[in-house]
Amino acid sequence: MYGITGNGYRLVSSYSPKGDQPKAIEQLVEGVQRGDRWQTLLGVTGSGKTFTISNLIAQVGKPVLVMSHNKTLAAQLYGELRQFFPDNAVEYFISYYDFYQPEAYLPALDKYIAKDLRINDEIERLRLKATSSLLSGRRDVIVVSSVSCIYGLGSPEEWKAQIIELRPGMEKDRDQFLQELVSLHYVRDDMKPGPGKFRVRGDIIDLVPAHEELAVRVEFFGPEIESLQTFDMQSGEVLGRDDYAFIYPARQFVAGEEQMRHAMLAIENELAGRLNELRGENRLIEARRLEERTRYDLEMMKELGYCSGIENYSRHLAGREPGDRPHCLLDYFPEDYLVVVDESHVTLPQIRGMYGGDRSRKTILVEHGFRLPSALDNRPLRFDEYVGLVPQVVCVSATPGDLELEYSGGVIVEQLVRPTGLLDPPVEVRPVKGQIDDLLGEIRKHTARGFKALIMTLTKRMSEDLDDYFRKTGIRSRYLHSEIKSLERMQILRELRTGEIDVLVGVNLLREGLDLPEVSLVAILDADKEGFLRNTRSLMQIAGRAARNSEGFVVLYADVLTRSIREVLDETSRRRKIQQAYNEEHGIVPQSIIKSVEQVLNTTGVADAEERYRRKRFGLEPKPERLLSTLIDTLTAEECYSMAESLRLEMQEAALKMEYEKAAYLRDEITKFEHRANEAGKGI
């Protein structure tokens, strides 16, 4: 068992650094300790980049923000880091919306689209837990986040000022404490309290902090707190007595009474000025619309201390000047934290693009009287603001982009040697003429040895036609592109991994996360058509899909040796020489990563569940309700959420077709899956 203890972190792993990992870890640690603001880790597919970063975190001892460009990869990183750091605060911060339709207005159609959303309570709890851990003073905090971390949050100073500290023996009036809970947006629920709720039984107040699952019991004796206990709200079992407790706000946007009063006054003043401006331009409809909406929001803020869309008034609530950047998750970190940007060639451009899209949509809302101009300041960070905020950054990618190379000064830390000894697959360029027949021969050669193939085409139509041709020639093939629903994509991937099909044809197979050990052949048709999916980085990324197999081989069909192809050939040759030399020096024989069918089914079980569920639902098997109940009990929380999402789309389609009975039936099924998901999630 390998481990590192010290600097507040405890890293635990069943394996130790191998290959290029020790050298990469040493160089990254030296860079952080030297004060380098930007570093780039170039790690080939399968080289163990996450383990390298975990060693870096353990050795430098700083709070860490790990950024990923989508929720799925963020969840994977969160799971891996929790395993590496079981005793430390590994937190998860992504958008808490299961569904989100932003507020928008389409002037050409004179159509207003109201904000529509559905919040995932568990993710909201995890977000609050992340901010709570950061403000608790702990140094051993790792937050895994999507780009949600650059969007507006409440002020950390105000949020921290609202925290309630409780200790046995301290003087505190019971009624005053209840008022404080309500001001922090806790809700009284004497029947079924959960996170962010409390119940009152005489001098005993039970509450579940918004970021926790266990409850706190506060017992009063006269004007003071007699005792604090932690207990399980479901079973009632007391788990222990506490010497103190901190109650954090139940929402990200909180404001004290005085701050709220100043904010409402500022909103009134801005509204008056904007109404004069609109009326002066004879835009009476816009003026009336803005006045009605804003006054309604002000009334809600006055009565409840909150309103729907309160984030649009965040500039006034925080007392910021026009144009000032909003507070975000980065402000909750101490000054010396470390940022790790995973898949930086995608994540950094995504960060850079967030501001423009958000401002374009909100400018239209402001122009047509749906929002005050201050709503423009409820926005994600601009890229220059992001760069100015982050103290030290480590970019991680198999194909670093221009941005990270520029900020790193062109200096990169390479991790080219895999612990498994696998080499980058050889790349061969072949002429376009006769490419299909040649490809057919290669496919048969590889599938005869029990391996699989990935084929990249230029268009969706080409992928469908090629798949049809392969089927006619006896090749077990499927096509995969953006028009195929997510659950069906998962089922297709499962079929590839379990041996039901041998070939996958698609346009952009990069986004599928196809790190499949069974794939030994990657073929790219029309590789000389320069563009987004035929540039150097895309070609290197797709070639890496064959890097987990010792028989990996890449074919580029091209008549012209473009700059991108030359760079791929040169870089692959360079890497193979380094990897081969290391293997010879250490006597390593490359071996493919092999997974059992059981492991494959575990990772793609949601597709299997979808198939079984549909059979039961359409009466292909007896007693569907009994069997459905049995099926649901076998699913994980993630699988249940995926099933619920699939059914929700069908429910919406049924409602649009006025098939209300079917929609109601689907609604009930969704409720079952969501209930099971919540139960399964508690067992994680």
Swiss-Prot record:
Helicase ATP-binding domain mapped to chain residues: 30-188
Listed Pfam families: Helicase_C, ResIII, UVR, UvrB, UvrB_inter
GO molecular function, one term: helicase activity
Intervals of motif Beta-hairpin: 96-119
Residue span, UVR domain: 641-676
BP term (GO), one: nucleotide-excision repair
Domain Helicase C-terminal: residue ranges: 435-601
CDD domains, per database record: DEXHc_UvrB, SF2_C_UvrB
Keyword Cytoplasm: yes
GO CC annotation, single: cytoplasm
Disulfide bonds: none
Compartmental location: Cytoplasm
UniProt KW keywords: ATP-binding, Cytoplasm, DNA damage, DNA excision, DNA repair, Excision nuclease, Helicase, Hydrolase, Nucleotide-binding, SOS response
Chain positions recorded as ATP binding sites: 43-50
Function recorded in the entry: The UvrABC repair system catalyzes the recognition and processing of DNA lesions. A damage recognition complex composed of 2 UvrA and 2 UvrB subunits scans DNA for abnormalities. Upon binding of the UvrA(2)B(2) complex to a putative damaged site, the DNA wraps around one UvrB monomer. DNA wrap is dependent on ATP binding by UvrB and probably causes local melting of the DNA helix, facilitating insertion of UvrB beta-hairpin between the DNA strands. Then UvrB probes one DNA strand for the presence of a lesion.
Entry remark concerning the domains of this protein: The beta-hairpin motif is involved in DNA binding.
Record note on quaternary structure: Forms a heterotetramer with UvrA during the search for lesions. Interacts with UvrC in an incision complex.
Family recorded in the similarity comment: Belongs to the UvrB family.
Protein name listed in UniProt: UvrABC system protein B
